[in-house]
Amino acid sequence: KFEPTRPMQGIGAHMIGIVTAQELRENLGDVFVSGRTCTEWIDFSISAIERLFLKPELEALLEVVGPNGELIDHHDGRTLNPGHAIECAWFIMHEGVRRKDSRLVSLGLTILDWMWERGWDEE
């Protein structure tokens, strides 16, 4: 849902979508939920994260973006949450290991490396 004042979307629904679908698939099989299999929901969410929230030019996974993945010039749009991003990276890596998909593992590792660096306090 977007509000007309400051249209934006958060990464949370996609990352929770991944882990929820992983758990459903693990316990119930690759069942259909709202017209998609669990694996299709995982693919949908990983694709959205990669397309909208991953910003290689910033070496960051953003918490909030505009409706089409654009940067938001407001404090909401500049929020980084390394812990959240690292959790997201774990879900993507877990899926990559399950599928033996080195591209997904690499994507997760890239997110982990970028956000670990951003979140680490040298002091």
Feature roles, as predicted:
Residues K1-E123:
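Glycan-recognition and catalytic cores of secretory/periplasmic carbohydrate-active enzymes
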